[in-house]
Swiss-Prot record:
Family: Belongs to the class-A beta-lactamase family.
Descriptive protein name: Beta-lactamase AST-1
Keywords, sorted A to Z: Antibiotic resistance, Cell membrane, Hydrolase, Lipoprotein, Membrane, Palmitate, Signal
Further details from the record: The class A beta-lactamase family has a specific amino-acid numbering system, sometimes called Ambler or ABL numbering and often misspelt as Amber. A multiple sequence alignment was used to derive a consensus sequence and then the consensus was numbered taking into account insertions and deletions. This allows use of identical numbers, e.g. for active site residues, despite differences in protein length. UniProt always uses natural numbering of residues, hence there appear to be differences in numbering between this entry and some papers.
Residues at the site labelled Increases nucleophilicity of active site Ser: 94
GO CC annotations on file: plasma membrane
Amino acid sequence: MTFSALPFRRADRRRLLAAALAACALTLTAACDSGTVTVPVTDSVTTSAVADPRFAELETTSGARLGVFAVDTGSGRTVAHRADERFPMASTFKGLACGALLREHPLSTGYFDQVIHYSAAELVEYSPVTETRVETGMTVRELCDAAITVSDNTAGNQLLKLLGGPEGFTASLRSLGDATSRLDRWETDLNTAIPGDERDTTTPAALAADYRALVVGDVLGAPERDQLKAWLVANTTGATRIRAGLPADWTVGDKTGSPAYGSALDVAVAWPPGRAPIVIAVLSTKSEQDAEPDNALLAEATRVVVDALG
Protein backbone atom coordinates (compact mmCIF):
# COMPACT_ATOMS: atom_id res chain seq x y z
CA MET A 1 0.00 0.00 0.00
CA THR A 2 1.34 3.43 -0.90
CA PHE A 3 0.42 7.03 -0.26
CA SER A 4 2.01 10.44 -0.31
CA ALA A 5 2.89 12.15 2.97
CA LEU A 6 0.77 15.27 2.85
CA PRO A 7 0.45 17.71 5.77
CA PHE A 8 -2.75 17.74 7.79
CA ARG A 9 -5.10 20.55 6.93
CA ARG A 10 -4.68 23.68 9.04
CA ALA A 11 -8.03 23.12 10.74
CA ASP A 12 -7.06 19.55 11.62
CA ARG A 13 -3.84 20.76 13.22
CA ARG A 14 -5.70 23.38 15.23
CA ARG A 15 -8.21 20.83 16.49
CA LEU A 16 -5.45 18.41 17.46
CA LEU A 17 -3.51 21.07 19.32
CA ALA A 18 -6.60 22.40 21.08
CA ALA A 19 -7.64 18.93 22.16
CA ALA A 20 -4.22 18.10 23.50
CA LEU A 21 -3.95 21.36 25.38
CA ALA A 22 -7.37 20.95 26.92
CA ALA A 23 -6.75 17.38 27.95
CA CYS A 24 -3.19 17.53 29.18
CA ALA A 25 -1.44 20.88 29.46
CA LEU A 26 -3.21 22.06 32.59
CA THR A 27 -2.18 19.00 34.61
CA LEU A 28 1.28 17.53 34.29
CA THR A 29 -0.14 14.05 34.06
CA ALA A 30 -1.64 12.51 30.99
CA ALA A 31 -3.96 9.56 30.68
CA CYS A 32 -4.11 9.97 26.92
CA ASP A 33 -4.09 6.69 25.00
CA SER A 34 -2.46 3.97 27.12
CA GLY A 35 -0.98 4.61 30.54
CA THR A 36 -0.64 7.60 32.82
CA VAL A 37 2.62 9.51 32.70
CA THR A 38 3.95 12.13 35.05
CA VAL A 39 6.34 14.47 33.27
CA PRO A 40 8.72 16.48 35.48
CA VAL A 41 8.87 19.74 33.59
CA THR A 42 8.38 22.25 36.40
CA ASP A 43 10.74 23.93 38.82
CA SER A 44 9.02 22.24 41.75
CA VAL A 45 10.17 18.87 40.45
CA THR A 46 13.78 19.67 39.64
CA THR A 47 14.52 21.68 42.78
CA SER A 48 14.83 18.39 44.71
CA ALA A 49 17.50 17.07 42.33
CA VAL A 50 21.16 16.79 43.23
CA ALA A 51 23.11 19.84 41.97
CA ASP A 52 26.76 18.95 41.41
CA PRO A 53 29.31 21.83 41.32
CA ARG A 54 31.33 19.95 38.72
CA PHE A 55 28.84 20.97 36.03
CA ALA A 56 29.57 24.66 36.63
CA GLU A 57 33.28 23.89 36.43
CA LEU A 58 32.74 22.19 33.07
CA GLU A 59 30.95 25.30 31.82
CA THR A 60 33.88 27.46 32.84
CA THR A 61 36.47 25.30 31.11
CA SER A 62 34.42 24.71 27.95
CA GLY A 63 32.90 28.16 27.46
CA ALA A 64 29.50 26.55 26.86
CA ARG A 65 26.17 26.72 28.66
CA LEU A 66 25.38 23.23 29.90
CA GLY A 67 22.05 21.70 30.82
CA VAL A 68 21.71 18.31 32.49
CA PHE A 69 18.89 16.20 33.82
CA ALA A 70 19.21 12.53 34.73
CA VAL A 71 17.02 10.14 36.66
CA ASP A 72 17.61 6.65 37.97
CA THR A 73 14.20 5.11 37.31
CA GLY A 74 14.79 2.49 39.99
CA SER A 75 15.69 4.69 42.95
CA GLY A 76 14.10 7.92 41.71
CA ARG A 77 17.35 9.76 42.40
CA THR A 78 17.94 12.69 40.05
CA VAL A 79 20.82 14.95 39.03
CA ALA A 80 20.22 18.38 37.51
CA HIS A 81 22.00 21.48 36.26
CA ARG A 82 20.07 24.21 34.43
CA ALA A 83 17.43 21.52 34.01
CA ASP A 84 14.59 23.97 33.40
CA GLU A 85 16.44 26.31 31.04
CA ARG A 86 15.66 26.24 27.33
CA PHE A 87 18.04 24.69 24.83
CA PRO A 88 17.61 23.86 21.14
CA MET A 89 15.71 20.66 20.40
CA ALA A 90 17.14 20.06 16.90
CA SER A 91 17.27 16.42 15.80
CA THR A 92 16.37 15.05 19.23
CA PHE A 93 12.78 15.51 18.02
CA LYS A 94 13.15 12.56 15.65
CA GLY A 95 12.99 9.86 18.31
CA LEU A 96 9.95 11.55 19.82
CA ALA A 97 8.27 11.75 16.41
CA CYS A 98 8.66 8.02 15.91
CA GLY A 99 7.38 7.45 19.43
CA ALA A 100 4.32 9.56 18.67
CA LEU A 101 3.59 7.54 15.53
CA LEU A 102 4.02 4.27 17.42
CA ARG A 103 1.57 5.57 19.99
CA GLU A 104 -1.02 6.42 17.34
CA HIS A 105 -0.45 3.34 15.17
CA PRO A 106 0.52 0.07 16.89
CA LEU A 107 2.81 -2.16 14.84
CA SER A 108 0.04 -4.72 14.39
CA THR A 109 -1.93 -2.27 12.23
CA GLY A 110 0.61 -2.45 9.40
CA TYR A 111 0.94 1.33 9.37
CA PHE A 112 4.73 1.22 9.55
CA ASP A 113 4.88 -0.99 6.45
CA GLN A 114 3.16 1.60 4.27
CA VAL A 115 5.30 3.31 1.65
CA ILE A 116 5.69 7.09 1.74
CA HIS A 117 6.56 8.78 -1.55
CA TYR A 118 8.36 12.11 -1.73
CA SER A 119 9.96 14.14 -4.49
CA ALA A 120 13.55 15.20 -5.12
CA ALA A 121 12.40 18.76 -4.46
CA GLU A 122 11.64 17.78 -0.86
CA LEU A 123 15.20 16.66 -0.12
CA VAL A 124 17.05 18.88 2.34
CA GLU A 125 20.66 19.04 3.46
CA TYR A 126 22.04 15.87 5.05
CA SER A 127 19.71 13.16 3.82
CA PRO A 128 22.06 10.21 3.18
CA VAL A 129 19.32 7.58 3.05
CA THR A 130 16.30 9.37 1.62
CA GLU A 131 18.29 10.85 -1.25
CA THR A 132 18.88 7.32 -2.55
CA ARG A 133 15.21 6.32 -2.34
CA VAL A 134 13.35 9.05 -4.22
CA GLU A 135 12.18 6.68 -6.96
CA THR A 136 10.97 3.91 -4.66
CA GLY A 137 9.84 5.79 -1.58
CA MET A 138 10.35 4.43 1.93
CA THR A 139 8.16 2.70 4.47
CA VAL A 140 7.34 4.52 7.68
CA ARG A 141 9.52 1.97 9.46
CA GLU A 142 12.45 2.80 7.17
CA LEU A 143 11.91 6.53 7.65
CA CYS A 144 12.09 6.11 11.43
CA ASP A 145 15.22 4.00 11.11
CA ALA A 146 16.89 6.63 8.92
CA ALA A 147 15.75 9.55 11.07
CA ILE A 148 16.98 8.02 14.32
CA THR A 149 20.04 5.95 13.40
CA VAL A 150 21.71 8.41 11.00
CA SER A 151 19.60 11.55 11.68
CA ASP A 152 18.43 11.84 8.06
CA ASN A 153 16.75 15.25 7.81
CA THR A 154 14.35 14.54 4.95
CA ALA A 155 13.18 11.46 6.83
CA GLY A 156 12.53 13.71 9.82
CA ASN A 157 10.41 16.02 7.69
CA GLN A 158 8.38 13.14 6.27
CA LEU A 159 7.65 11.95 9.81
CA LEU A 160 6.59 15.47 10.77
CA LYS A 161 4.16 15.49 7.84
CA LEU A 162 2.56 12.31 9.14
CA LEU A 163 2.06 14.01 12.51
CA GLY A 164 0.57 17.18 11.05
CA GLY A 165 3.75 19.26 10.91
CA PRO A 166 5.56 20.97 13.79
CA GLU A 167 2.22 21.97 15.31
CA GLY A 168 0.98 18.39 15.32
CA PHE A 169 4.26 17.19 16.77
CA THR A 170 4.01 19.74 19.58
CA ALA A 171 0.46 18.59 20.25
CA SER A 172 1.74 15.04 20.67
CA LEU A 173 4.13 16.29 23.36
CA ARG A 174 1.31 18.11 25.11
CA SER A 175 -0.64 14.84 25.23
CA LEU A 176 2.32 13.31 27.08
CA GLY A 177 2.07 16.10 29.66
CA ASP A 178 5.01 18.11 28.32
CA ALA A 179 3.87 21.73 28.47
CA THR A 180 7.38 23.05 27.78
CA SER A 181 8.93 21.66 24.59
CA ARG A 182 7.90 23.12 21.24
CA LEU A 183 8.68 22.59 17.59
CA ASP A 184 7.93 25.50 15.28
CA ARG A 185 9.78 24.79 12.05
CA TRP A 186 10.91 22.01 9.74
CA GLU A 187 14.34 20.63 8.94
CA THR A 188 16.69 22.30 8.42
CA ASP A 189 15.32 25.69 9.54
CA LEU A 190 14.83 24.41 13.09
CA ASN A 191 18.61 24.30 13.59
CA THR A 192 19.29 28.05 13.92
CA ALA A 193 19.54 27.73 17.74
CA ILE A 194 19.70 31.51 18.19
CA PRO A 195 20.31 32.41 21.86
CA GLY A 196 17.09 33.64 23.46
CA ASP A 197 14.89 32.36 20.61
CA GLU A 198 12.32 29.99 22.12
CA ARG A 199 11.36 28.43 18.80
CA ASP A 200 12.19 24.75 18.51
CA THR A 201 13.37 24.43 22.11
CA THR A 202 13.05 22.12 25.07
CA THR A 203 14.61 21.78 28.52
CA PRO A 204 16.77 18.94 29.85
CA ALA A 205 14.05 17.96 32.32
CA ALA A 206 11.26 17.96 29.73
CA LEU A 207 13.26 16.11 27.09
CA ALA A 208 14.34 13.42 29.55
CA ALA A 209 10.76 13.03 30.75
CA ASP A 210 9.45 12.57 27.21
CA TYR A 211 11.98 9.87 26.39
CA ARG A 212 11.37 8.22 29.74
CA ALA A 213 7.63 8.10 29.06
CA LEU A 214 8.06 6.55 25.63
CA VAL A 215 10.99 4.18 26.21
CA VAL A 216 10.59 3.18 29.86
CA GLY A 217 6.99 4.05 30.76
CA ASP A 218 3.72 2.46 29.72
CA VAL A 219 2.68 5.01 27.11
CA LEU A 220 3.56 2.51 24.37
CA GLY A 221 2.69 -1.15 24.19
CA ALA A 222 5.55 -3.60 24.67
CA PRO A 223 6.13 -4.26 20.93
CA GLU A 224 6.18 -0.54 20.16
CA ARG A 225 8.44 0.23 23.12
CA ASP A 226 10.85 -2.50 22.02
CA GLN A 227 10.91 -1.11 18.48
CA LEU A 228 11.68 2.42 19.64
CA LYS A 229 14.41 1.08 21.93
CA ALA A 230 15.92 -0.89 19.04
CA TRP A 231 16.11 2.20 16.83
CA LEU A 232 17.73 4.25 19.60
CA VAL A 233 20.24 1.54 20.49
CA ALA A 234 21.18 1.30 16.78
CA ASN A 235 21.92 5.03 16.57
CA THR A 236 25.30 5.76 14.96
CA THR A 237 25.67 9.47 15.74
CA GLY A 238 26.27 9.48 19.50
CA ALA A 239 29.45 7.48 20.08
CA THR A 240 31.43 10.47 21.39
CA ARG A 241 28.70 12.03 23.54
CA ILE A 242 26.67 10.38 26.33
CA ARG A 243 27.73 6.90 25.23
CA ALA A 244 31.40 7.85 25.69
CA GLY A 245 30.76 8.75 29.33
CA LEU A 246 29.00 5.52 30.29
CA PRO A 247 30.50 2.18 31.32
CA ALA A 248 31.17 -0.11 28.36
CA ASP A 249 28.88 -2.88 29.63
CA TRP A 250 25.76 -0.68 29.70
CA THR A 251 23.23 -0.93 26.88
CA VAL A 252 22.56 2.58 25.54
CA GLY A 253 20.03 4.08 23.16
CA ASP A 254 20.25 7.77 22.29
CA LYS A 255 19.33 10.57 19.91
CA THR A 256 21.65 13.47 19.18
CA GLY A 257 21.31 16.96 17.71
CA SER A 258 23.92 19.40 16.40
CA PRO A 259 22.40 22.77 15.47
CA ALA A 260 24.17 26.13 15.17
CA TYR A 261 26.01 28.03 17.93
CA GLY A 262 28.22 25.05 18.68
CA SER A 263 25.27 23.21 20.18
CA ALA A 264 25.84 19.59 21.15
CA LEU A 265 22.72 17.74 22.28
CA ASP A 266 22.11 14.17 23.38
CA VAL A 267 19.35 12.35 25.21
CA ALA A 268 19.76 8.71 26.17
CA VAL A 269 18.23 5.80 27.98
CA ALA A 270 20.86 3.51 29.50
CA TRP A 271 20.39 0.03 30.94
CA PRO A 272 23.08 -0.86 33.51
CA PRO A 273 23.43 -4.62 34.09
CA GLY A 274 21.02 -5.76 36.78
CA ARG A 275 19.59 -2.29 37.39
CA ALA A 276 16.65 -0.17 36.31
CA PRO A 277 17.18 2.18 33.33
CA ILE A 278 18.76 5.60 33.71
CA VAL A 279 17.48 8.45 31.53
CA ILE A 280 19.97 11.22 30.76
CA ALA A 281 19.64 14.48 28.82
CA VAL A 282 22.78 16.56 28.32
CA LEU A 283 22.42 19.72 26.23
CA SER A 284 25.00 22.42 25.52
CA THR A 285 25.23 25.56 23.42
CA LYS A 286 27.68 28.42 22.88
CA SER A 287 27.51 32.14 22.15
CA GLU A 288 29.21 32.14 18.72
CA GLN A 289 27.14 31.06 15.73
CA ASP A 290 29.99 29.21 14.00
CA ALA A 291 31.42 27.57 17.13
CA GLU A 292 32.19 23.85 17.03
CA PRO A 293 30.10 21.45 19.15
CA ASP A 294 31.93 20.06 22.17
CA ASN A 295 31.26 16.33 22.21
CA ALA A 296 33.81 15.75 24.97
CA LEU A 297 31.84 18.11 27.23
CA LEU A 298 28.79 15.87 26.98
CA ALA A 299 30.86 12.78 27.71
CA GLU A 300 32.45 14.38 30.77
CA ALA A 301 29.09 15.66 32.04
CA THR A 302 27.78 12.11 31.72
CA ARG A 303 30.65 10.80 33.84
CA VAL A 304 29.63 13.29 36.52
CA VAL A 305 26.04 12.03 36.28
CA VAL A 306 27.10 8.40 36.72
CA ASP A 307 29.26 9.30 39.72
CA ALA A 308 26.55 11.45 41.31
CA LEU A 309 23.83 8.82 40.91
CA GLY A 310 26.08 6.18 42.41
